[in-house]
C-alpha cells in the first residue's frame, strides 16, 4: 500500500462527544458506515454529532473492490431498526440525518421498504429533521427506486463511484447506466428532491473520463456531485493508482460548477456524507438563487 501524502493524514478520533455518539449507536444496535467503511473523517464528524447510519445489517451481498464493508450472507432484518434509529436521532438532536445501507440483493424489494420505514419513523418523531438517503441500486428490482422517492427524502444520493471503464474491476455487480437511470428516475418521480452522486478518483481514471461522468450526471438532472480520493482499505482491495493533488480537486470543482451542478464538494477527504447538513443548507440557497435569477430574466 502506498504511503499517504500529508494532505490525507488525519488525527486519531477522540473526545467526549465522539465516545457519546459511539456508545449511543451501540446502545440502539445501529451500524454506521463511518465505522464499517473506515471513513477517515469519523473523528471530525462524530465530534460534531454527525453520523451516517447504515441500515439493513452490517453484511453486504456484494464485494466491491473498493469497499471495506463485510460481504457474505446477511442476517435477517431487525424489525426494530427504524424505531431505534428515530430514537437515536432524537437523542443526538440531529437536524439532518444521513441513512445508507449495505446491498441486500437477497431481499424481494432490495431493502427499499426498510428505507421508507426509517424515513417515516424519523418524521413521526420530529417533522423538522431533514433526511438524506444514500441508497444502493436495489438490483433494479421493480418499484424499489420509486418507493423510496415517493417517501420524499430531502436528498436522494446514489453514488456512481467510478468511471464506466473501471466498473468491471471496481463494481463488478453494478451497472453504470442503471445508476444513471436510478438518479434520473428519482428526479422524474419527485422533482423537489435534491439528487446527489459521488465519484472516487485515484483508481486509474483519466480527467476526460471524469468530465464525461459529470456530463452524464447532469444529463440525469443530478444537483450535487461529490469527488474524493480513493483510499485502499486493506491490501486485498483495489490498489491506489495515484494520489490526486488538492489543486486538481479544485480544478474538478471549477469544471463541475461550469457544467451546471448546484453544489460541488471536491477534495481529498470528501466523502458522500461529509458536511452533509451544511451542504444541504447551501443546496437550498443555491436553488433559491437559481430560481430568482431565472425569474429576473
Swiss-Prot record:
InterPro entries referenced in this protein's UniProt entry, alphabetically: Aldolase_TIM, Elp3/MiaA/NifB-like_rSAM, LIAS_N, Lipoyl_synth, rSAM
A Pfam family this chain is assigned to: LIAS_N
Annotated keywords: 4Fe-4S, Cytoplasm, Iron, Iron-sulfur, Metal-binding, S-adenosyl-L-methionine, Transferase
Keyword Transmembrane helix found: no
Enzyme class (EC, first level): transferase
Xref: PROSITE patterns: RADICAL_SAM
Domain Radical SAM core: 46-262
EC number(s) per entry: 2.8.1.8
Binding-site positions, [4Fe-4S] cluster 2: 60, 64, 67
Protein's pathway: Protein modification; protein lipoylation via endogenous pathway; protein N(6)-(lipoyl)lysine from octanoyl-[acyl-carrier-protein]: step 2/2
This protein's GO CC annotations: cytoplasm
Family under the similarity heading: Belongs to the radical SAM superfamily. Lipoyl synthase family.
Protein name stated in the entry: Lipoyl synthase
Name of the gene this protein is made from: lipA
Amino acid at each position: 500500500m502506498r504511503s499517504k501524502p500529508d494532505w490525507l493524514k488525519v488525527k486519531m478520533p477522540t473526545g467526549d462527544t465522539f465516545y457519546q455518539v459511539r456508545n449511543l449507536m451501540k446502545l440502539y444496535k445501529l451500524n454506521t458506515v463511518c465505522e464499517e467503511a473506515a471513513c477517515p473523517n469519523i473523528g471530525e464528524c462524530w465530534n460534531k454529532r454527525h453520523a451516517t447510519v447504515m441500515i439493513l445489517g452490517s453484511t453486504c451481498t456484494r464485494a466491491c473492490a473498493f469497499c471495506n464493508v463485510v460481504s457474505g450472507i446477511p442476517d435477517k432484518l431487525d424489525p426494530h431498526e427504524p424505531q431505534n434509529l428515530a430514537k437515536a436521532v432524537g437523542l443526538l438532536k440531529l437536524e439532518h440525518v444521513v441513512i445508507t445501507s449495505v446491498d441486500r440483493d437477497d431481499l424481494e424489494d432490495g431493502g427499499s421498504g426498510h428505507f421508507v420505514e426509517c424515513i417515516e419513523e424519523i418524521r413521526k418523531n420530529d417533522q423538522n429533521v431533514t433526511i438524506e438517503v444514500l441508497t444502493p441500486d436495489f438490483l433494479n428490482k421493480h418499484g424499489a427506486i420509486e418507493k423510496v422517492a415517493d417517501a420524499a427524502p430531502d436528498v436522494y444520493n446514489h453514488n456512481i463511484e467510478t468511471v464506466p471503464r473501471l466498473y468491471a474491476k471496481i463494481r463488478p455487480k453494478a451497472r453504470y447506466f442503471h445508476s444513471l437511470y436510478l438518479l434520473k428516475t428519482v428526479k422524474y418521480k419527485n422533482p423537489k428532491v435534491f439528487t446527489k452522486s459521488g465519484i472516487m478518483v485515484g483508481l486509474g481514471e483519466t480527467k476526460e473520463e471524469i468530465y464525461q461522468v459529470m456530463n452524464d450526471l447532469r444529463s440525469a438532472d443530478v444537483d450535487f456531485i461529490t469527488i474524493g480520493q480513493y483510499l485502499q482499505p486493506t491490501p486485498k482491495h483495489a490498489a491506489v493508482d495515484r494520489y490526486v493533488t488538492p489543486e486538481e480537486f479544485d480544478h474538478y470543482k471549477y469544471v463541475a460548477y461550469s457544467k451546471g451542478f448546484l453544489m460541488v464538494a471536491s477534495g481529498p477527504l470528501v466523502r458522500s456524507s461529509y458536511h452533509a447538513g451544511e451542504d444541504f443548507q447551501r443546496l437550498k440557497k443555491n436553488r433559491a438563487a437559481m430560481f430568482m435569477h431565472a425569474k429576473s430574466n
